[in-house]
């Protein structure tokens, strides 16, 4: 019988290594094909389904590991329980625990009798604070149970400065039991401590959820006597679903976070200071309106909403800049609250009659104008340009009659004329030419040696055309012939002169 042979068989858990694989969800290093239980008769998969192949592989693997034909149900269950206990991670030394399992003869009862708390890791305790009540809890305890225990402690004792820290009596057996019950949910949870801010909702109901806030990311900023908390990134967590290390704090109440400051005296002496701090004041007002969503909904009649508007317009002489007075921007999430608060503040009475604000006669505000030399700067663009063209002083160049608006532009332009004159003037005979090429051709005359020389008589010429005409003398060539008298000429100029003088009537 399998039950009689079971005590003599070792489960050999130390030879089984759990490794993940892409081809199957679980794979053991032990050779499955050599096991007699692995030779099972499966009908061949005609469609080649991957799910069917995966199930067949898992079937063979678990049969090879548990060996149901050799072991009883209790032995297989004991082996699964031991493997699950090792995977949870509560044991300190897995190798020592496996040796104890082998020493007990693979009997779960004997194995549990030999166990002590020395093989377990000490539980990690987390300091939790909620509405004045503080206690230490195990990291594996559910969040819902933590809140329940803190509520019981709060109802039993009222928080005082003397008993502010009261540890809850939680034994290790209870902590370990709680951790094993929630081990399935705790395998993927991190061990980073977070700070939870538990507050009442705007409707005044009991706590429905916890606001989990990272402690490192949300510092508190103080300004005077008003404390602002900026939740840059907050998320809601349901009760009993989170088992991270948490630290609860009570939400700020109207008594803890004052929303009103003492009214300031906006007298003539303080007007200049208000001008300089106009931007900072409006920025603080928007921040305080943003925080009004986390407080039970009341009438927001704070002075911080009013003081962002009534600052005199900065002026320069008698010309205002035209800067709008209200430059406060509120975030999207608080636009409704801002509209309600502004409607309540300004619909019933004049804001200038609020206490602490000195009432002044309303001065007429002129229309904003551009800061130009005179008030004609508001004219349309075309007329504006015409006026400047009409009033501008023009400077005329005497050489080319060009007009310039500035004297420095005229002087710069006249230098170009001087440069051109120096380029067009012959240095030897002071003769002026229209083009630079003509000046260069003329300068050849003043050279001691002409560049073009006759090869027959070695006479030199300044131009190539003159040299060609001279060479015709030596060759006797006369290319130009008169059609009327058949007379020949060497040069075209002589030919045309002959036509004008002798054949004009013809």
Curated annotation (Swiss-Prot):
It holds the Pfam family zf-C2H2. One of its GO terms (molecular function) is zinc ion binding. Keywords: Chromosome, DNA-binding, Metal-binding, Nucleus, Repeat, Telomere, Transcription, Transcription regulation, Zinc, Zinc-finger. It is found in: Nucleus; Chromosome, Telomere. Residues 37-119 form the SCAN box domain. Residues 238-264 are annotated as: Disordered. The keyword DNA-binding applies. It comes from the Eukaryota. A zinc finger (C2H2-type) spans 395-417, 424-446, 452-474, 480-503. One of its GO terms (cellular component) is chromosome, telomeric region. GO terms for biological process: telomere maintenance via telomere lengthening. InterPro entries: SCAN_dom, SCAN_sf, Znf_C2H2_sf, Znf_C2H2_type. Coiled coil: none annotated. PANTHER family: ZINC FINGER AND SCAN DOMAIN-CONTAINING, ZINC FINGER AND SCAN DOMAIN-CONTAINING PROTEIN 4. This is Zinc finger and SCAN domain containing protein 4D. The gene is Zscan4d.
């Amino acid at each position: 019988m399998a039950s009689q042979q079971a005590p003599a068989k070792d489960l050999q858990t130390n030879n089984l290594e759990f490794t993940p694989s892409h081809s199957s969800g679980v794979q053991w290093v032990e050779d499955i094909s050599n096991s007699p239980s692995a030779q099972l008769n499966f009908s061949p998969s005609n469609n080649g389904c991957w799910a069917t192949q995966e199930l067949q592989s898992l079937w063979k693997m678990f049969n090879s590991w548990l060996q149901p034909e050799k072991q009883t149900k209790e032995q297989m269950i004991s082996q699964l329980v031991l493997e699950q206990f090792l995977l949870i991670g509560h044991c300190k030394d897995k190798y020592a625990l496996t040796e104890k399992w082998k020493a007990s003869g693979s009997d779960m009862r004997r194995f549990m009798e030999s166990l002590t708390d020395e093989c377990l890791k000490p539980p990690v305790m987390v300091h939790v604070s909620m509405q004045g009540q503080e206690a230490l809890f195990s990291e594996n305890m559910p969040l819902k149970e933590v809140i329940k225990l803190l509520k019981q402690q709060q109802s039993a004792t009222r928080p005082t400065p003397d008993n502010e820290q009261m540890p809850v009596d939680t034994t290790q057996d209870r902590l370990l039991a709680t951790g094993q019950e929630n081990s399935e949910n705790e395998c993927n949870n991190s061990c980073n401590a977070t700070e939870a801010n538990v507050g009442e909702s705007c409707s005044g109901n009991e706590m429905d959820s916890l606001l989990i806030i990272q402690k490192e990311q949300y510092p508190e900023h103080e300004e005077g006597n008003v404390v602002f908390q900026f939740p840059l990134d907050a998320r809601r967590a349901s009760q009993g679903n989170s088992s991270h290390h948490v630290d609860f704090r009570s939400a700020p109440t109207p008594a803890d976070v004052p929303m009103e400051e003492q009214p300031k005296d906006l007298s003539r002496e303080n007007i200049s200071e208000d001008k300089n701090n106009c931007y900072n004041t409006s920025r603080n007002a928007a921040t305080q309106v943003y925080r009004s969503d986390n407080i039970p909904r009341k009438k927001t009649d704070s002075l911080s909403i009013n003081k962002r508007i009534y600052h005199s317009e900065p002026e320069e002489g008698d010309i205002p800049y035209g800067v709008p007075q209200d430059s406060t921007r509120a975030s999207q999430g608080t636009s409704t609250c801002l509209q309600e608060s502004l409607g309540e503040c300004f619909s019933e009475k004049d804001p200038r009659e609020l206490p602490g604000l000195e009432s002044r006669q309303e001065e007429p505000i002129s229309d904003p104008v551009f800061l130009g030399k005179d008030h004609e700067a508001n004219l349309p663009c075309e007329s504006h340009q015409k006026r400047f063209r009409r009033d501008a002083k023009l400077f005329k160049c005497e050489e080319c009659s060009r007009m310039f608006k500035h004297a420095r532009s005229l002087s710069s332009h006249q230098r170009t004329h001087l440069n051109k004159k120096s380029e067009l003037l012959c240095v030897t005979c002071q003769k002026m030419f229209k083009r630079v090429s003509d000046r260069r051709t003329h300068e050849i005359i003043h050279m001691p040696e002409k560049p073009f020389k006759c090869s027959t008589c070695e006479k030199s010429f300044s131009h190539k055309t003159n040299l060609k005409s001279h060479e015709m003398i030596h060759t006797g060539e006369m290319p130009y012939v008169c059609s009327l008298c058949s007379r020949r000429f060497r040069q075209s100029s002589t030919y045309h002169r002959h036509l004008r003088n002798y054949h004009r009537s013809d």
